[in-house]
Amino acid sequence: MNNLLSKFKDFVGLNEPVEYEYDYDEMEGEQYVYPQQQQTPAAVPTQEESRSNRRLRNRASATTATTASTTGINGVVQQESGMGSVMNNVIGMPGALNGMSEVVVLEPRTFEEMPQAIRALRERKSVVLNLTIMDPEQAQRAVDFVAGGTYALDGHQERIGESIFLFTPSCVQVRTQTGLVNEMSQTQPRPRVPNSGSQVWQPEQIQMIQ
């Protein structure tokens, strides 16, 4: 009887434990596979996340652009400072920007000291030249030399005493009791005695000699 029942069950399909286990294993495998398939779409960002990421990227790009513009401004400033340094290499007139004027008093003994007066005038300094201790001929030569240099520099000259002269650059105005001295007063050169060897004979004198 048992054999008949078992055969009948086998024929009907009631005794299929293996198939049930196989189906169970198959369903269990599908359960393991299905969560993986569900996790895969979860990795795709949603619209809100994409918008937030886009905002972050826009902010990052704006920050980068601001940094680049700041760097560009700094570059321009550095370039301008570089130009300022180049301009600082240009030598200006001494004493013209500091608002201070300087007066140099010279009491030369020889004519070889006269270039000091010209050098001081080129440095925009006034010169008081005291020639009382010099030989008269050397003193006249010194005055002519310094006066020529002052005239070349568009300066001014004024006699302030016996053998004492004031030479000023063009940036200095000289005022006296009579008024403002705008033009350079030339010194009176000493009359030169013509050399007898270079005397020019007049036609009448030549006729008398003949």
Swiss-Prot record:
Keyword presence, Membrane: no
Region (Disordered): 36-69, 182-210
Swiss-Prot/TrEMBL keywords: Cell cycle, Cell division, Cytoplasm, Septation
Entry GO terms, CC: cytoplasm
Disulfide feature: none
Low complexity bias (residue ranges): 36-47, 59-69
Compartments, record wording: Cytoplasm
Transmembrane segments annotated in the record for this chain: none
Keyword Cytoplasm among UniProt keywords: yes
Any one Gene Ontology BP term: FtsZ-dependent cytokinesis
Main location: cytoplasm
A Pfam entry, by short name: SepF
Family under the similarity heading: Belongs to the SepF family.
Function statement: Cell division protein that is part of the divisome complex and is recruited early to the Z-ring. Probably stimulates Z-ring formation, perhaps through the cross-linking of FtsZ protofilaments. Its function overlaps with FtsA.
Binding partners and assembly: Homodimer. Interacts with FtsZ.
Protein name: Cell division protein SepF
